[in-house]
Amino acid sequence: MNLHEYQAKALFAEYGLPVSEGFACDTAQEAVEAAGHIGGDMWVVKCQVHAGGRGKAGGVKVTGDKEEIRAFAEHWLGKNLVTYQTDEKGQPVAKILVESCTDIANELYLGAVVDRATRRVVFMASTEGGVEIETVAEETPELIHKAIIDPLTGPQPYQARDLGFKLGLNPTQMKQFTKVFMGLAKMFEDHDFALLEINPLVITDEGNIHCLDGKIGIDGNALFRQPKIRDMHDPSQDDAREAHAAKFELNYVALDGNVGCMVNGAGLAMGTMDIVNLHGGKPANFLDVGGGATKERVAEAFKIILSDSNVKAVLVNIFGGIVRCDMIAEGIIGAVKEVGVEVPVVVRLEGTNANLGRDVLASSGLDIIAAESLTDAAVKVVAAAEGK
């Protein structure tokens, strides 16, 4: 689960971090009034969506004219913003963030992630703020400095000072940076973050550290113990199919291909997508029905896959460990009959009751293409998607 920038900054403020005064507005009139309340003669207005690249897409504007704020809000509210991180439909804009304008002398980067390699929370800092950190990591990795947080001792001020020294901060800025670092580390642990970014973390003309942006991703598995964070969820930013799948405990991610995939197990699902790609196809989705799949969940998975008009063929790849292949076969048959599937369906069953599952499919009278191996399944589904 992701938070909007205005929500992230509200959390920053709760932990004593320096942020700009700002208001998230639902209407153009509110945006104009917010600028008046903030005061000053320059403001920044930003579309609130769960995607980066807003500035290049026209979703951020710096202005000293309140009528331009009104025009910006009227233009974007209720529309979709398309950036390089969204699909072609973009993300809906329901709020506009109006903030005071901050003078910038230098831009830095500060972020944290749960790193699987070290099994620790790792903070990253760089002098290359204001640009995509992935680009910095690829082109100039030596400019990214790290601090690994020991879960037993927690974050330490010396780690902040070490990062600050590498960023070239002066003693006053070092104290401010240490406060920001310690606050973010506590926030990360308190609220079960999976990702945190301030890009850019700026040094103002007065020489002060300031959080100019905020990006937060929450570990979805921890939401049951984070009611405050859970209430911040904006369902309008979710893919409708992904949100629907979650209700049935299906792990679904929409992609842009034409081969629908239904698999049990995340690893097998990724392997299935890889082999479809290897044989010239493009997966339309990632869908893991899980080890405890039922006939109802399989039927619902079919409905979700087929709700994508780009899907030209469906590959069902099931390895029966916990789940029984004959039960999956019955679910497939029920789904095909209920939904009225009009695209080719390729099925590969292995494991518990696999032979029985194949017999169930063979005796169903439905036009289902059986596959003997994963390679055979990939070849057949790619050919079917191409109409061969």
From Swiss-Prot:
Catalytic reaction annotation: succinate + ATP + CoA = succinyl-CoA + ADP + phosphate; GTP + succinate + CoA = succinyl-CoA + GDP + phosphate
Pfam families for this protein: ATP-grasp_2 (PF08442), Ligase_CoA (PF00549)
Annotated metabolic or biological route of this protein: Carbohydrate metabolism; tricarboxylic acid cycle; succinate from succinyl-CoA (ligase route): step 1/1
E.C. numbers: 6.2.1.5
Coiled-coil intervals: none
TM region positions: none
Cofactor(s) this protein requires: Mg(2+)
Binding, substrate: N264, G321, I322, V323
Domain ATP-grasp: 9-244
Cofactor annotation remark: Binds 1 Mg(2+) ion per subunit.
Positions of Mg(2+) binding: N199, D213
Family indicated by similarity: Belongs to the succinate/malate CoA ligase beta subunit family.
Summary of the function given for this chain in its UniProt record: Succinyl-CoA synthetase functions in the citric acid cycle (TCA), coupling the hydrolysis of succinyl-CoA to the synthesis of either ATP or GTP and thus represents the only step of substrate-level phosphorylation in the TCA. The beta subunit provides nucleotide specificity of the enzyme and binds the substrate succinate, while the binding sites for coenzyme A and phosphate are found in the alpha subunit.
PANTHER family: SUCCINATE--COA LIGASE [GDP-FORMING] SUBUNIT BETA, MITOCHONDRIAL (PTHR11815:SF10), SUCCINYL-COA SYNTHETASE BETA CHAIN (PTHR11815)
Oligomeric form and interacting partners: Heterotetramer of two alpha and two beta subunits.
Protein name: Succinate--CoA ligase [ADP-forming] subunit beta
Organism: Shewanella halifaxensis (strain HAW-EB4)
